[in-house]
Swiss-Prot record:
Belongs to the peroxin-22 family. This is Peroxisome assembly protein 22. It is found in: Peroxisome membrane. It comes from Candida glabrata (strain ATCC 2001 / BCRC 20586 / JCM 3761 / NBRC 0622 / NRRL Y-65 / CBS 138) (Yeast). Its main location: membrane. Coiled coil: none annotated. GO terms for cellular component: peroxisomal membrane. The gene is PEX22. InterPro entries: Peroxin-22 (IPR024359), Peroxin-22_C_sf (IPR038613). It is a single-pass membrane protein. Keywords: Membrane, Peroxisome, Peroxisome biogenesis, Transmembrane, Transmembrane helix. The chain crosses the membrane at residues 9-27. It holds the Pfam family Peroxin-22.
Length: 174
């Protein structure tokens, strides 16, 4: 008989805690709805549209870029003479330089945001950088380096670039 009373006591405590938690969650959600509706009213009392504002687009060239880019610089892509590095490096773009690229011609012209140009010592380190950065789009010359199968999990889109001119055109278009 005393065992049954102990179980009833535990059940009463569990029920009280559950009711308290449910009441707290209801109160919190109800108070957030009130604050949101008060926030969405203009001074004249009319309600505003509940629209999610899009992040401002990144300006690059003449058009806008909404994505973050990771560009792997290989031997075919290392001659980027006409690129405006000061403008490009202000955007959400990271350049990873392959270990086989010895003469990256524009490395002396870059004055700001040099942390966005990463010289990789090994291909394993290069792919570790790509996985860690998790950029929306990866630009790579597949003729110079083999892309691992799992990289698609870390980048939304993988684009094949054949030459440095095509890369410059791509950066100007986006």
């Amino acid at each position: 008989m005393s065992k049954r009373r102990k179980n009833q006591g535990y059940l009463a405590i569990i029920a009280a805690v559950s009711i308290g938690a449910a009441a707290y969650l209801w109160w919190r959600n109800h108070s957030e709805d009130d604050s949101v509706s008060k926030f969405n009213q203009q001074d004249d009392g009319t309600a505003q549209d509940n629209q999610i504002k899009e992040k401002p687009a990144i300006k690059l060239g003449k058009k806008r870029l909404h994505r973050s880019l990771c560009v792997i610089i290989s031997n075919k892509l290392s001659n980027l003479v006409e690129l405006d590095w000061d403008e490009i490096l202000q955007e959400d773009i990271v350049f990873l330089i392959l270990p086989s690229v010895n003469d990256f011609q524009n490395s002396n012209d870059i004055k700001t945001d040099t942390h966005k140009i990463i010289n990789c010592d090994t291909e394993l380190g290069l792919w570790a950088c790509v996985r860690t950065l998790k950029k929306n789009e990866l630009l790579v010359c597949a003729d110079d380096i083999k892309v691992p199968d799992d990289i698609g999990r870390y980048c939304d889109k993988i684009s094949q670039i054949k030459s440095s001119q095509q890369l410059m055109n791509y950066l100007d278009e986006t």
